[in-house]
Curated annotation (Swiss-Prot):
Gene Ontology terms describing biological process: chromatin remodeling; DNA-templated transcription; regulation of DNA-templated transcription
Chain's role: Required for replication-independent chromatin assembly and for the periodic repression of histone gene transcription during the cell cycle.
Protein name in the entry: Protein HIR1
Gene: HIR1
Organism: Cryptococcus neoformans var. neoformans serotype D (strain B-3501A)
GO molecular-function terms, A-Z: nucleosome binding
Cellular location(s): Nucleus
Amino acid sequence: MKVTKPNWVEHTVGEKKAKTAIYSISVHPDGTRLATGGLDHKVKIWSTLPILDVEAEKEEENPKLLCTMSSHTGSVLSVRWAHHGRFLATGSDDQVIMIWGLDPDGGGRLWGSDEINVENWKALTRLVGHVADVVDLAWSRDDTMLASVGLDSTVWIWDGLTFERLRKLDLHQGFVKGVCWDPVGNYLATQSDDKTVKIWNTEDWSLAETISKPFETSPQSTFFRRLSWSPDGAFIAASNAMNGPVFVAAVIDREGWASDISFVGHENTIQVAAFNPRLFFPEGEPKGRATASSMLALGANDFSISIWRNTLYKPLVVLKDIFGADLMDLCWSNDGYVLYGSSVDGSVCAIQFEPSEFTDLADFSATELVLREYDYKPKRAHQPLAVHSSAASITNGFGPSTTTSTHVNVLQPKKGKAKRRVDLSNGNINAGPSAGPSRQALRPPPPVDPFSGPIQGFASPSTAQASTARMFEDAHRAFGPGSGSISGTSPRAGDKRKASGSYEDPTRGVRGRGMPVQQPIQQFEVQIIRAPMVAPSPSDAGPSKAYLPYPQVQSILRAQAIGNESRSIYLEARNTSDPKGENVLCYFADGEQRWMDYLPKAALAVTVTKNFCAAACEDGSLRVYSPAGRLILNMKLSGLVYDLQGEDKMLLIITMDCQVRVINVRNGKAFSPPSSIHHLLFPGSSSFHSFDIISCTVRPNGVPVIITSEPQAFAYDASLHEWSTIASPPIAGIQPLPSGPSGPLSVVDQIVAKSAPVTTTEKSNAPWIEESYVMSQFEMKLRGTVLLDSKEEHKHWLLGYMKYLGDENFAERAGEVMKDLIGPVYHQSKPTGWEPKLLGVDKREIAAEVLDVLSKTLQGKNVASVWYDVLDKMKADEGSW
């Protein structure tokens, strides 16, 4: 065993370059790079060669510091390499997760610093969801998912390829300070200051178990509670546990989640546990679960590290006072021979073992063999809670379509919205929404693994580096707004996100006097300037008053609309970071600026259609303009705007206080009074359990549609002044209704279906449950198509409903439907409230079509015969007049 503490691995602050805390450390899967995150807001990547080899350290041609990344605006609390080595995830107390990728063509001097980047790791995207410090990160073993935890008491699950949000878990009641994945793939474990470890089932993200006994008396003073899962999936080692007055690491057994065993010996709280990724087997014995053992490293606030085998009652080695302050993080190299640690004192250590010391260490094939014994096959499809574009199809007026969109908003940053996917297997970019009619194009890449193999050494480009270069270029295009197919619900951009746009300059007609010209920015960087100056007061937030996440002020917002005759229309808001500067709103059409205006405060959201454009500012003001630049509406809202969406002449506004408004811009009137969606997002009396908005749109008839991560879809019913459910996930064990024709409701159905967790629950034995479910689904769809003003879909579901009623002999229900369609048979002295038309079609014409379907069913013939007679008599009476 050899212990190395390189004094040149450091994070520094101030003019005197004083060493500062290194909160997290992670070694690359190929063992050549070490990533560190510190109090200086920076992420640094170091070469491990001069750390592990004294002779190599002396040679100047061996670089030590490979790259410094400084996009975070807060302390970097967690750094984690993906197992394939292509991505580095970092979490910070700026509430942001950054995903970094290697640009093989990069390098050079770091801006504002003397540091030279040998490699150029750039931010591919930023993940926004946490509203407090991001404390820990973990990649699933197959890298299909990334988990993050933070001081907002939430756990976020992200897609490991597209980085869309899959799920938010919010059952912890305290800061969540540690996370790890089950190597088998069945579970996720999280540890919190609420003195529990929670086990989550990855099939449906239900809570499988809560373990609290070992932590009942544990102190809440630790910065982290980093736990680790053994490579054979048999145990979890949880930090900061207590056994009476003794500081221990608790061992949680996978079988029954018992926690009777613990590792004892440290003199202060244990902050981090880290299992060696390799398994150990006695020589000469068959390799399997029964003979496998594992190695565990523990780091504590007594400034020491201990290394254990689960088959022994005492540690293999204890390194006392290896640091001068609390230990923050530990990680093992993939070969199992090197353990790295970091500390608040600003130093790192490398503990290197020789193969002769670990004679029973096995290769990864043995681990695979053990994990296969669990015979676990994931039933879930790793699909994100897809967010639909609000770009309206010309054919149906709602949601994405293969036809030309009515409008497309680009680079209007909103949390939890549609993202473009990058297919890293072939370099293709799918720019459409992540669910809906075009979903087929967004499936995961074929089985050939684009991430196989490590990133090669520094000396010469390799095939792996070329693959990384292509990945970096693809991701650059995907995370920038190079296409006009990203909707106004696209996610917030990173600290810096490059974008490009082409503006045609066709022959222009003669117009009158225009405004001073500013050119649209062809290449630009979107930067987070600051938080809004006006935000909901935390003191106002409580069980009955919860707020949506507030947006950040960005340097540039851009929205695009594609109108008739392929006219190119852009709206661009340019926010200034200079207190004395001006915030400018520019409108471009056909490749040139038509007008501009100065905003009173920085813009938080913009949207544009062929009929109007709108900008919401951080002072709560909302300004709506005509295409010629007339200020049509200038309103002061009750709160900051969370989202803006436009459709035809309708403007949808969602504010941070969960209020939804729809305004008819053409006549300047509200579609209905403001309505709250608080009860849709924060059900019950507690705001700790909440749902997210994964899609929000407005129909041309003014009806807003909200889809939540429950998942449920709601449309506002102006006649009731309430939200009506128009789509819900299927019931376990019952076959859902076949899909209907394309239209707004079918788009909503697809989002909800793909957002619903996969369940293996058996069908209920309750009597008539299937019939009840089928009829309620038909009836919900009928109401939904009326609210969404979808004539073709309504006809399809009405005829299907009547056929089902006839086949199953539900004569009374069929009779009620016919009575509503045909209306009063005789003249009524008092108004009955019966409307003769439905979706613009005469109800009695609809009745005739319905009767044709009903008459062809075995049980519905008699009902149809009665109503045929009524309809014929009414037609005869009308003819006699």
